[in-house]
A protein has these predicted regions:
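Glycine-rich phosphate/adenylate-binding loop and adjacent beta-alpha elements
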Residues: 1-46
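Short, surface-exposed secondary-structure boundary micro-motifs
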Residues: 9-10, 88, 179
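A glycine-rich, Thr/Ser-enriched phosphate-binding loop motif common to dinucleotide/cofactor-binding enzymes
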Residues: 28-34, 50-73, 86-94
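Short helix-loop-beta connector
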Residues: 51-53, 76-82, 146-147
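Adenosine-nucleotide cofactor-binding segment
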Residues: 82-88, 100-163
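C-terminal hydrophobic helical "lid"/dimerization subdomain
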Residues: 162, 166, 207-255
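Rossmann-fold dehydrogenase core element
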Residues: 170-177, 186-228
Length: 255
């Protein structure tokens, strides 16, 4: 049969999302795909990129598509733009790869000097260790020549948003794709107004956007960064490994 990947929102084809919850999301509102076999409607899947392994393709429906939508669909990234990624998780690494391939300059934050070295080896222009630099947003702003970044792929939420705003240029674009630091908190509204920023909330993407991303991947040399693969029976250990934040890129299950 065909080599396929699932959709995060099976009933979201294009245009406006028909739902504001995860009631039809596999692995959330309905049973997911941590199984050997599954029966689902054909239109709940798209073709996987030609030549990709199953592990590689499995990284696309959530992390890959979120990064694609953040930068390409919503951010309308162009060559020469400055992009800030936070950390080295799956979405951030995909954002790094997409941004570099499109001719942008990438900046990053990370929690360790070891990860900082790895990021620089991938082509990142500059890295700030946020455990050593509390005001990392101001530091990134200075590193861009006091201009600020055009795009921030914001994964932290209330605990990092103020720093992402500080790192941004006037008229910049922040895509909020995660809330790792909490679901609510203070928002520096005056700073948003002063910098005339656009802040867009994004939850993955639709079928049409996933197909666009896959077409792009088939004509580039981008492949996902897979940190570690766990057998299905060690699924709990996989989640614990993710929780500890030691990974770079994606963690996969071998079914």
């Amino acid at each position: 049969g065909d080599h396929v990947v699932s959709l995060f929102f099976p009933n979201w084809v294009k245009a406006e999302c028909p739902q504001a919850d995860f009631s039809y999301t596999p692995g959330d509102g309905i049973d997911g795909y941590a199984t050997s076999y599954v029966v689902r409607p054909e239109n709940w899947f798209t073709h996987a990129p030609k030549g990709w392994t199953h592990h590689e393709a499995a990284t696309l429906p959530t992390a890959g598509l979120t990064a694609w939508r953040a930068l390409v669909v919503e951010g309308k990234i162009k060559a020469g733009d400055d992009v800030l990624i936070l950390g080295t998780g799956g979405v951030s690494i995909f954002a790094l790869q997409f941004a570099l391939k499109m001719g942008a300059r990438v900046w990053a934050t990370t929690s360790s000097n070891e990860k900082a070295k790895w990021l620089l080896e991938q082509g990142v222009a500059g890295v700030v260790n946020y455990r050593e630099e509390e005001n990392w947003g101001e530091k990134i702003f200075e590193m861009t020549g006091n201009r600020g970044v055009d795009h921030v792929v914001e994964i932290g939420g209330p605990g990092t948003l103020a720093q992402s705003i500080a790192a941004s240029r006037i008229g910049g674009h922040i895509t909020l794709i995660g809330v790792f630091t909490g679901i609510s908190g203070d928002v520096p509204t005056a700073a948003i107004m002063a910098k005339q920023l656009t802040i867009k909330g994004v939850t993955v993407g639709n079928r049409s956007e996933q197909q666009d991303m896959i077409r792009a991947l088939e004509v580039t040399d981008i492949h996902p960064m897979i940190d570690k693969v766990f057998p299905l029976e060690e699924i709990q250990a996989a989640f614990e490994y993710q929780r500890d934040g030691k990974h770079i890129g994606k963690i996969c299950l071998d079914v």
